[in-house]
């Protein structure tokens, strides 16, 4: 394991506020928003590039697979390098990747851009998890960590609807130009507000996997894998589902996704507050919401436009709390090795996004839109069962 060196008095003065933590939360928001943006622009992007929606969905898979590998070994890859410089560098990579996506004339260029994005996302996720306690005074360490992960949660539910709104108003490429500009801003912000974050020691690849021997950590990661895999099997293709099965127009889809996003932000903080008292209860509430919404959509005959929109809000409320609750579960299971469990959690989370979008793409191309919602419901139900029978601590 790596250990952080004590901050200098100058560093402490700079980190008394939560501004550096907010800057990192902005970075996690941007990397996750960038990863998932194809969800909200899937139909126009596929049409513009002359590919099927299933193939377009692979852009999510590519990013998730690369990020999963990189996040798991990120601390070992950067060794003793100052985390401040590493974060700035890979936010610049994110800026370039989104610009290249906006310029992509075909799927090959798009795939290359998404590989770059996956590297950036993996590095930021893999390092950000352990920075909360380093950047805040002891009494605010938990709040700092929650804020950092709130960037992930909020992006998961709000980034895509905002991007869909921009794309429907100005074209799908404009959404990626906006993300590129935001990445450039975040890079500068990190340079201004983030103090040096040196480390002592070096992590050998594979050492952190020993934390999986803790049954609480393993259960928490299993819950994450199941619910996230199911979620992205369905949510990646939620736009064509809403258009074909619920009869929503593109404008109404954008509005429904925006409502989903607002609900998700609320869910993030409500479930996050509950997670501080009981990680298990928080997980069951979050995952239970996903189970209820996806099951109703999957087996409700497509549902009418209004009821489908309401169910999407319930989905957002539940999934908005998944990141903070499952990460809190894994941290509570092994408080002495939070950095190791967080890195593995991030890797598993991203791998599940990748696998989920692949499964969803295969299902939607072979069995249609309703079938992907059934996959989503099944994955979430399995996660809920694990949460019922397992405990964060022995």
Predicted regions, residues:
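Primarily marks hydrophobic transmembrane alpha-helices of the MFS/SLC 12-helix fold
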Residues: 84-87, 110, 280-284
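Cytoplasmic helix-loop-helix junction between adjacent transmembrane helices
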Residues: 113-152
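C-terminal transmembrane helical hairpin of 12-TM major facilitator-type secondary transporters
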Residues: 281-326
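Helix-loop-helix hairpin linking two adjacent transmembrane segments in secondary transporters
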Residues: 107-109, 137-195
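Helix-breaking motifs and short loop linkers at transmembrane-helix boundaries and internal kinks
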Residues: 50, 82, 103-109, 247, ...
């Amino acid at each position: 394991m790596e250990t952080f060196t004590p901050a200098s008095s100058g560093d402490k003065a700079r980190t008394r506020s939560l501004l550096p933590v907010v800057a990192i939360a902005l970075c996690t928001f941007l990397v996750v928003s960038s990863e998932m943006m194809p969800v909200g622009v899937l139909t126009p992007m596929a049409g513009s590039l002359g590919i099927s929606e299933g193939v377009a969905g692979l852009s999510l898979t590519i990013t998730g697979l690369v990020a999963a590998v990189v996040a798991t070994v990120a601390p070992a890859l950067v060794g003793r390098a100052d985390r401040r410089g590493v974060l700035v560098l890979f936010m610049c990579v994110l800026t370039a990747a989104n610009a290249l996506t906006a310029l992509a004339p075909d799927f090959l260029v798009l795939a290359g851009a998404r590989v770059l994005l996956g590297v950036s996302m993996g590095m930021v996720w893999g390092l950000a998890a352990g920075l909360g306690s380093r950047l805040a005074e002891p009494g605010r360490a938990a709040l700092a960590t929650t804020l950092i992960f709130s960037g992930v949660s909020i992006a998961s539910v709000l980034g895509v609807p905002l991007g869909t709104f921009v794309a429907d108003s100005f074209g799908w490429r404009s959404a990626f130009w906006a993300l590129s500009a935001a990445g450039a801003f975040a890079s500068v912000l990190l340079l201004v507000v983030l103090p040096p974050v040196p480390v002592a020691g070096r992590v050998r690849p594979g050492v952190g996997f020993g934390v999986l021997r803790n049954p609480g950590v393993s259960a928490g990661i299993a819950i994450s894998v199941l619910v996230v895999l199911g979620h992205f099997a369905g949510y990646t293709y939620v736009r064509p589902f809403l258009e074909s099965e619920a009869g929503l127009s593109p404008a109404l889809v954008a509005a429904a996704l925006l409502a989903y996003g607002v609900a998700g932000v609320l869910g993030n903080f409500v479930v996050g507050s509950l997670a501080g008292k009981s990680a298990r209860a928080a997980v069951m509430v979050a995952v239970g919401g996903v189970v209820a919404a996806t099951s109703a959509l999957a087996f409700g005959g497509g549902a009418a436009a209004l009821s489908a929109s309401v169910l999407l809000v319930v989905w957002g409320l539940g999934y908005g709390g998944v990141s903070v609750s499952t990460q809190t579960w894994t941290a509570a299971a092994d408080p002495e090795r939070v950095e190791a469990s967080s890195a593995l959690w991030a890797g598993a989370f991203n791998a599940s996004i990748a696998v989920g979008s692949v499964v969803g793409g295969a299902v939607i191309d072979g069995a249609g839109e309703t079938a992907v919602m059934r996959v989503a419901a099944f994955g979430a139900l399995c996660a809920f069962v694990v949460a019922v029978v397992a405990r964060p601590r022995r």
